[in-house]
Every structure is written in structure tokens, then in C-alpha cells.
């Protein structure tokens, strides 16, 4: 696949990603947060952004952080709401990869907002710690 979603319990990431085909050039959408479910216990990343940790596990992939700041039931609901469309944030270091993820976000009915590189946007939408998790925002048409 050209675009791969990664949404796995944080401590299971290394095992889930081990032994998979070459990542080179693929887009990996990091939909993870550094918590241990179901207790929502934060994982200490020593000041790193979680997407940097994911990038280390998918060498050569173009990582875009997205689909992680809203609960699953909100993501599964109709993106049209209150006279507008629900907002999804994304960030990444590769402009072409971000453009492809933005197109996917639009195609499924959401409004995408680019938060810049992973070092900035990843921190903004990372749970815990960022100000954007669970912010269910609507862009009015």
C-alpha cells in the first residue's frame, strides 16, 4: 500500500511494525498517542514527539501525524455537522506526503488543517500534553 495507517496500542508498536515490507517512500499516517490503554497511562518519551518515535520504527517512510486528536466514535460519525464539516489536524515534514493526506481527509468529508512540521504540529495534537486532543471543531460553510 502507498498509504498505511498505524493505530496500535503504544507498547505494541514495535511488534506490530516489525518484519513488514520495506517502508521506503510510503506514507505512514501516525494515528497513535503515547498512552497505554485502557488506563490512559502516559508513556515517557524523554521530550520527543511521538511521531519521531514512530518514524524510527518505519525507516524511510514519510510520516504524517493525523486522525489522532478525536475519539474513534467521533471520527466514525458523519463529518458534516452544525452547518459545516468537522476539522482534522495533520502535520508532517514531507510536503508531498502532507498533500496526499490532506486530499484523503477532504475526500472522506473532513476539513484538513496543516499544523506544520512534526516538531510543532505533532506536539499540538499529541495526547497527552497538546492543547488540541478532543477539540471537536467545525468549519462552517
Question: Predicted regions: what is each one?
Answer:
Residues 9-12, 69-71, 94-96:
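Short beta->alpha connector loops
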Residues 85-141:
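Active-site-lining helix/loop region of Rossmann-like oxidoreductase modules
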Residues 3-6, 59, 106-113:
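Generic secondary-structure signature for well-ordered alpha-helical cores
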Residues 1-38:
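Rossmann-like NAD(P)-binding element
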Residues 23, 46-47, 80-84, 130-133:
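Short, hinge-like loop/turn segments at secondary-structure boundaries
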Residues 32-80:
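Rossmann-fold NAD(P)-binding glycine/threonine-rich loop
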Amino acid at each position: 500500500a502507498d498509504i498505511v495507517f498505524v493505530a496500535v496500542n503504544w507498547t505494541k508498536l514495535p511488534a506490530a511494525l516489525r518484519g513488514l515490507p520495506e517502508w521506503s517512500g510510503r506514507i505512514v499516517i501516525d494515528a497513535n498517542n503515547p498512552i497505554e490503554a485502557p488506563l490512559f497511562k502516559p508513556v515517557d518519551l524523554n521530550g520527543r514527539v511521538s511521531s519521531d518515535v514512530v518514524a524510527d520504527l518505519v525507516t524511510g517512510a514519510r510520516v504524517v501525524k493525523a486522525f489522532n486528536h478525536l475519539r474513534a466514535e467521533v471520527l466514525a460519525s458523519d463529518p458534516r455537522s452544525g452547518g459545516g464539516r468537522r476539522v482534522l489536524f495533520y502535520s508532517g515534514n514531507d510536503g508531498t506526503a502532507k498533500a496526499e493526506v490532506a486530499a484523503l481527509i477532504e475526500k472522506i468529508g473532513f476539513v484538513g488543517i496543516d499544523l506544520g512540521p512534526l516538531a510543532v504540529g505533532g506536539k499540538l495534537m499529541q495526547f497527552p500534553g497538546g492543547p488540541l486532543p478532543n477539540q471537536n471543531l467545525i468549519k462552517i460553510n
